[in-house]
Amino acid sequence: MSIDKRGRELWRRIAPARRAAFFGCLTTGLLVHLYAFTNLIPNSDGLSRVYDLQQMTVSGRWFLHYASALNNFTQMPMAAGLLSLLFLGLAAALITSLLDIHSALLGGLSGAVLAAFPCLGYTFLYLFTAPAYCLSILLAALAVWLAKRGWAGGLLGAAALALSMGIYQAYASVAISLALLAVLKETLAPQASLRETWGLGLRLVFTLAAGAALYYAVLLVFLKVKNLELLSYLGMDAASSGYPLKELPRLVLDACKQAASFFFRPGAANAFTTPFLVLVDLLALAVGALCWFLRLRAGALWRELWRPLGGLAMAALLPLGMGFSQILSPYAQPTPLMKYAYVSAYLAVVLLLQRGDEVSARERVLLAPAAAVWAAALLLFCLNTNNLLYTASAQAHRATESYLTRLFARVEGCPGYEPGMEVAFVGAIAQEQLRAQIPSYAQVDHYSAPRDNVAVLNKHIYHYLRDWLNIPVEELDEETMKSIAQTAWFKAMPLYPAPGSVALAEGRVVVKLQEEYTPKSDFEIAYEDRR
């Protein structure tokens, strides 16, 4: 058989819904995130990581270094974007298989929603890790997909989940959410029995627990071999001193509240919800509930009491599964990036639409328009929110570039300055000097998404000048910066941009941006020495 025939045979073996999910994800992702892939607009963390080996064992991410090798440890927007969408597209294909989505249209919608969900936009502001993070999502989906295929698959799934968490722990919530959806699907499948569904549930619990245990065991090995301790990133260091079990009920309640706020409370913290999205989510809730009710009634499935009760239980647990990052990191507030698992709520609607497609033709006629309006409105919101995020970030970059270009022109114009001379920038850019005036930017405001300027800390000024403007100026050590800030002549200097705020002193140029120097935290210092 020729290679062309083998290729066609392989293509025919892939179900249309899986193909639609993959290409729906790839196409939608390219269209929605095109600006991020054709520009370089990372957040403040990305300023120092145009090239970075991503040695993040100190934050519990022991596999991130190896996964980041896929894009050569370098921020290359289009390459990173394509790799990310390829991994996400494969995840979409696995998810449609896991949830038994056999409609090509719904498969394509699943892929589109996975690619357009705004939490992914925040991920692409961390472009230096985006391919690795999307690989983590793929591994999380693979873990559940494998577990569904038997106990041997569960063992392999545990290994996949450990690798996923080794890239980023937050994506364990993706696996948990998908596991809940897999059980929900079984409650609506006439051929599934209570015993089989219990077996699947136990297998999924085993896979999730074994994967988390394996992740932690490997982490301990890495810490031992590298002679490291966990940093205070998201409370990871507290993990070694025990989990706050007394706080567990509060954390569970917080996770559920965060999920409710994310979808139904405009202006909620670490979210981007608007009144428009609330309407979209209410429509999703109505469509999903109607599909669930009609499916139970159509096959008289409601007569088997475990099916409606099991479905309600999975729906009740889904907010906790999506918000599991709060349980995993009890001392931190999950960021929008960490809430990617919330896309599972929309996948649940797609799952229920697929089951609703199995009801009578008259009922499908009622469902179709509402489902189409919901899908179109959701994708429109995602398109606008992602690009609002990118527009705000790009403006912050332009503002920072302009400001620091003018700032260094003042340095070069300082009497006595010579190329290669040390430059001490004491303080950060004053907030009142750079401030975005566009009201819509407030929707996507978060510390991980620059809105006013990118160089929010003293060290970011050096990173921007050196790695973004190619100006060879090195950051001074902490003791030097502290000693400069304590001198009488520095205290007498006016603040930038006033005349005299850039001056030659003690053989170096000093720029006074703030009245005092803010020392780096212990976390920052330890983070810079990570390995």
Which residues does each predicted region cover?
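Intrinsically disordered, polar/acidic, low-complexity terminal segments
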Residues: 2-58, 62-90, 97-111, 197-201, ...
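Juxtamembrane "helix-exit" motif on the non-cytosolic side of transmembrane helices
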Residues: 36-43, 116-125, 187, 217-225, ...
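Membrane-interface helix-loop-helix junctions at transmembrane boundaries of multi-pass membrane enzymes
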Residues: 196-197, 285-316
